């Protein structure tokens, strides 16, 4: 996602953390909760222990990770690959790679087991957008884009078909500073929804990536200040809701953790937003409803550094 505060006009709470004298703590305990709800104080998210069995007790057999890396080369320099090696996913999906295929860093070949690698990037915009999909298992079929020329120029979608499901990784367009691309985003949302509905009619679907929208108020720290900003406009939120209903798909994280607050995947580099957890949940694993019995866990790895987004991980028992 473009840098909010540098490239995007997204309101974030810039107040510094306040410390209180011991004598005042008892008097201000109630106020602290109010401040946290308003995005004015520390309210951190702790990723719970991984659940590696399905509701019926089947052990997880597939682990997928997704990460907006905000530039492959910079991410590698920040030790992003070290985290991937430790996490050891079966499939790794990357967004905002900002790298054409002929300039991919050699270090990517060092990833153990992820030898089947697929990349998409704009042909005429070096250093912009781009997605990647790396897998232990060779997919049955791989395709790029959503089949519409207007939407397939920026390297935003890879589709990989496996035996029991289809995986789509996407870097959804940002509505931009001043919402200059909001109309385009709405056209994208409609076309993407139709495309996914067609895929899901043939085989269960997993959609992952930076979907560039915080669906509900619980999904960002400062909802009141962002209702007219990219990523939280009524139009984008409605488009996301229509996607869930029409395809149909389930938000795996909210399916398991419907009321968990402060669970974000993106923080602007500005104003110490990450240390204060002033963030947005923009990255998702969405699943066909037929896959919900196989859902073991949907994780937000908020402590993993290397980008302005953190990685997310999905466990399925297929």
UniProtKB/Swiss-Prot annotation:
GO terms for biological process: base-excision repair; cell redox homeostasis; DNA catabolic process; DNA recombination; DNA repair; positive regulation of gene expression via chromosomal CpG island demethylation; positive regulation of transcription by RNA polymerase II; regulation of apoptotic process. The keyword Transmembrane does not apply. Probably binds two magnesium or manganese ions per subunit. Residues 289-318 are annotated as: Mitochondrial targeting sequence (MTS). The record marks 283 as: Important for catalytic activity. CDD domains: Ape1-like_AP-endo. A motif (Nuclear export signal (NES)) lies at residues 64-80. Residues 23-33 are annotated as: Necessary for interaction with NPM1 and for efficient rRNA binding. Disulfide bonds join 65-93. The record marks 309 as: Interaction with DNA substrate. The record marks 212 as: Transition state stabilizer. NPM1 stimulates endodeoxyribonuclease activity on double-stranded DNA with AP sites, but inhibits endoribonuclease activity on single-stranded RNA containing AP sites. The modification Phosphothreonine is found at residue 233. InterPro entries: AP_endonuc_1 (IPR004808), AP_endonuclease_F1_BS (IPR020847), AP_endonuclease_F1_CS (IPR020848), Endo/exonu/phosph_ase_sf (IPR036691), Endo/exonuclease/phosphatase (IPR005135). Its main location: nucleus. Keywords: Acetylation, Activator, Cleavage on pair of basic residues, Cytoplasm, Disulfide bond, DNA damage, DNA recombination, DNA repair, DNA-binding, Endonuclease, Endoplasmic reticulum, Exonuclease, Hydrolase, Magnesium, Metal-binding, Mitochondrion, Nuclease, Nucleus, Phosphoprotein, Repressor, RNA-binding, S-nitrosylation, Transcription, Transcription regulation, Ubl conjugation. It catalyses: a deoxyribonucleotide-2'-deoxyribose-5'-monophosphate-DNA + H2O = a 5'-end 2'-deoxyribose-5'-monophosphate-DNA + a 3'-end 2'-deoxyribonucleotide-DNA + H(+); Exonucleolytic cleavage in the 3'- to 5'-direction to yield nucleoside 5'-phosphates; a 3'-end 2'-deoxyribonucleotide-3'-phosphoglycolate-DNA + H2O = 2-phosphoglycolate + a 3'-end 2'-deoxyribonucleotide-DNA + H(+); a 3'-end 2'-deoxyribonucleotide-8-oxoguanine-DNA + H2O = 8-oxo-dGMP + a 3'-end 2'-deoxyribonucleotide-DNA + H(+). The N-terminus contains the redox activity while the C-terminus exerts the DNA AP-endodeoxyribonuclease activity; both function are independent in their actions. An unconventional mitochondrial targeting sequence (MTS) is harbored within the C-terminus, that appears to be masked by the N-terminal sequence containing the nuclear localization signal (NLS), that probably blocks the interaction between the MTS and Tom proteins. Multifunctional protein that plays a central role in the cellular response to oxidative stress. The two major activities of APEX1 are DNA repair and redox regulation of transcriptional factors. Functions as an apurinic/apyrimidinic (AP) endodeoxyribonuclease in the base excision repair (BER) pathway of DNA lesions induced by oxidative and alkylating agents. Initiates repair of AP sites in DNA by catalyzing hydrolytic incision of the phosphodiester backbone immediately adjacent to the damage, generating a single-strand break with 5'-deoxyribose phosphate and 3'-hydroxyl ends. Monomer. Homodimer; disulfide-linked. Component of the SET complex, composed of at least APEX1, SET, ANP32A, HMGB2, NME1 and TREX1. Associates with the dimer XRCC5/XRCC6 in a DNA-dependent manner. Interacts with SIRT1; the interaction is increased in the context of genotoxic stress. Interacts with HDAC1, HDAC2 and HDAC3; the interactions are not dependent on the APEX1 acetylation status. Interacts with XRCC1; the interaction is induced by SIRT1 and increased with the APEX1 acetylated form. This is DNA repair nuclease/redox regulator APEX1. The lineage of its organism: Eukaryota, Metazoa, Chordata, Craniata, Vertebrata.
